[in-house]
UniProtKB/Swiss-Prot annotation:
Domain of life of the native organism: Bacteria
Protein name, per record: C4-dicarboxylate transport protein
Localisation: Cell inner membrane
Keyword ATP-binding carried by entry: no
Organism whose genome encodes this protein: Burkholderia orbicola (strain MC0-3)
Lineage summary: Bacteria, Pseudomonadati, Pseudomonadota, Betaproteobacteria, Burkholderiales
């Protein structure tokens, strides 16, 4: 197979687009801010097919299961994994902030902070309780779930639809085959849309730099550096240890999904790479049923980057305003963050809303303290999204191995940079 010229490789194009976007945003901010529709348009094109792809992937995966108990088993294992790893992420964020103390020295009087700029985030945070979140998973109508692009609602519909098809067996084969064919068409659309990723990344990055400016980063560089460093440590050490235990290299895995990571970096939304990630995981030997269940669920329940960010941001505000938190208050913070993070999704800005929800339950720290990081949240959003997508990818491989449905030959070939791999029997064990 003839190797592509480097300038035709997608990730090279995305890197170039990001660099050009940064340059335009820095030197011509007024023009750069007008590039926002390019980024928004690309994300909308991807989100256009996310719902149908999740539905089709989950339905065909479940319909092919001989044992319906497996659906509950996979879901239970995934949720258990999510909670354990999320706890590690929260604790790591807490420990890093205590160790590096990025907020010490600001000496800000909370009374001088104007909370008007974050009022809208606070309102959204107060607008949904745990019960509301759970009830929101149930759609008003099937059409409404797809129209609004609600991932968890679509997942619920797909679980029910797939379960019925599995029960019908051969009588439902025509419907199953149709949905399987539709899945191929949808992924074909994704391949076409993905070619526009450099344009989307350019527009989003140009807008970000043009609107907020590189200068807005300077006063809070220590916080940004602490967050990025902690996220890298989490990926290399925590996820790296999990990957090694499962039998693969985290470095090679990150390299395998580099195109998806660059799309996320450019757009600051992990949803922008969801369909491509699902397809890559299947090609890497994960079973379709596990991919279909774990990845969409992980986008609400396994946001490792958001978890690190939340504990770090809360402690930063406390340090900057000279507020001492007791260990009991910090444990309460962890418990609250564990719950509020479940309401976040892969959309840009969701992390800031969940931060507002967390602060609202910890009254010791003023909600107005969020204005301290409002200007740099957009720059931290990229790191949150990158960590989230790596975390969900690793989770899918782990649960597949746990279920003895990981084709390790495919995984090895994929991580070595191999092309299409012939199917082999799935290997057992972790």
């Amino acid at each position: 197979m003839k190797k592509k010229p480097f300038y035709k490789v997608l990730y090279v194009q995305v890197i170039f687009a990001i660099i050009v976007g940064v340059i335009l945003g820095h030197f011509y901010p007024s023009i750069a801010t007008d590039m926002k529709p390019l980024g928004d348009g690309f994300i909308k094109l991807i989100k256009m097919v996310i719902g149908p792809i999740i539905f089709c992937t989950v339905v065909t995966g479940i319909a092919g299961m001989e044992d319906m108990k497996k659906v509950g088993r996979v879901g239970g294992k995934a949720l258990l994994y999510f909670e354990i790893v999320s706890t590690f992420a929260l604790l790591l964020g807490l420990a890093a902030t205590h160790l590096l103390r990025p907020g010490v020295g600001f000496n800000i009087d909370p009374a001088t902070l104007d909370g008007k700029a974050v009022a809208s985030y606070a309102a959204k945070a107060h607008g949904q309780s745990t019960v509301d979140f759970l009830m929101h998973i149930i759609p008003n109508t099937m059409v409404d779930a797809f129209a609004q692009g609600e991932i968890l609602q679509i997942l619920l519909i797909a679980l029910l639809f797939g379960s019925v098809l599995a029960h019908l067996g051969e009588r439902g084969r025509v419907v199953t085959d149709f949905i399987d064919g539709l899945t191929r068409v949808l992924f074909g659309i994704v391949h076409i849309v993905t070619k526009l990723a450099p344009i989307g990344a350019f527009g989003a990055m140009a807008f970000t730099i043009g609107k907020y400016g590189v200068g807005s980063l300077v006063p809070l560089l220590k916080l940004i550096g602490t967050f990025y460093l902690t996220s890298v440590v989490f990926v290399l050490v925590v996820l790296g240890a999990i990957a090694r235990f499962t039998g693969f290299s985290i470095i090679r895995f990150v390299s395998y999904i580099k195109e998806e990571l660059l799309i996320v970096l450019g757009t600051s939304s992990s949803e922008a790479a969801l369909p491509q990630l699902m397809e890559k995981l299947e090609k890497a030997g994960c079973s379709r049923s596990v991919v279909g269940l774990v990845v969409p669920t992980g986008y609400s329940f396994n946001l490792d980057g958001t978890n690190i960010y939340m504990t770090m941001a809360v402690l930063f505000i406390a340090q900057a305003t000279n507020i001492e938190l007791t260990w009991m208050q910090q444990l309460t913070l962890l418990a609250v963050a564990m719950l509020t993070s479940k309401g976040a999704s892969g959309v840009t800005g969701a992390g800031f809303i969940t931060l507002a929800a967390t602060l609202a339950v910890v009254p010791t720290i003023p909600l107005s303290g969020m204005v301290l990081i409002l200007g740099i949240d957009r720059f931290m959003s990229e790191c949150r999204a990158l960590t989230n997508i790596v975390g969900n990818g690793v989770a899918t491989v782990v649960v597949s191995a746990w279920e003895k449905e990981l084709d390790r030959n495919k995984l090895r070939q994929a991580l070595k940079g191999g092309g299409e791999v012939a199917p082999t029997e799935t290997t057992a064990g972790v």
